[in-house]
């Protein structure tokens, strides 16, 4: 019964259709979405069986999304279009911010993954480091003013070392997977985003 409930309500990890800013429809999956708390629901079911009390209540979720009706990411989210090398921010259905970007370097297999994610947190004044080498140094160390991760070590940040964004830069001189942004644009995005906000990445 609980597994049937999960199959009905869970959206995390499922494939969903996203209508992009450019007008395409793309199929995306990812960790963002609703997820029933199967342990809690099982415990509640056992309790109801033991007490004989049948009660109507809300289903308990271990992970929540923005909306139960329509697209579960709702109408406030960030969209990263790899093909256009552009980021869009929607708030309550209105486009309120956008910027050119540089994503993961395709030629070095640092391609940024597609998917539906949520912003983990945001932090100002951060040093981003690559993998640690045997001698104790790091593959790279980059100071950023605005750090907004959403997929492990992948996130939005300013890239003051770049003078150009957009175009085909990502194919030969892209990032290690992050979404590089102009400093002034990153500052404005930083002011808008919040923990748990949906982030949709697509080709």
Which positions does each model-derived feature cover?
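Exported/periplasmic cell-wall-interacting domains
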Residues: 14, 114, 130-203
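Short glycine/threonine-rich beta-strand-turn micro-motifs
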Residues: 1-77
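Short, surface-exposed linear segments at secondary-structure transitions and domain or protein termini
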Residues: 105-116, 169
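Structural recognition of the beta-strand scaffold that forms the well-ordered cores
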Residues: 78-80, 88-90, 97-99, 118-121, ...
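A structural motif detector for short, solvent-exposed N-terminal "entry" segments of globular domains
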Residues: 65-109
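Solvent-exposed, polar/charged alpha-helical surfaces in well-ordered, non-transmembrane soluble domains
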Residues: 3-4, 39, 43, 47, ...
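Short, surface-exposed secondary-structure junctions/capping segments
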Residues: 51-52, 111-124
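Solvent-exposed loop/turn segments at secondary-structure junctions
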Residues: 85-87, 95-96, 104-108, 123-127, ...
